[in-house]
């Protein structure tokens, strides 16, 4: 076993911080997320209104 002990950096109130970034992930702003949700809600409402006429 190693003779030197290494200690981990302290974390505040049990929260851990990760600094390495995953560049493969999709980056989206909060405004973009809200816009996407609103578009999906409008699309679903339109499907409920005109969907039965289109799909029978």
Curated annotation (Swiss-Prot):
Record's function text: Involved in protein export. The function of the beta subunit is unknown, but it may be involved in stabilization of the trimeric complex.
Name of the protein in question: Preprotein translocase subunit SecG
Location within or outside the cell: Cell membrane
Membrane topology label: Single-pass membrane protein
Quaternary structure and interacting proteins, as annotated: Component of the protein translocase complex. Heterotrimer consisting of alpha (SecY), beta (SecG) and gamma (SecE) subunits. Can form oligomers of the heterotrimer.
Side Extracellular, residues: 50-56
All ranges on the Cytoplasmic side of the membrane: 1-29
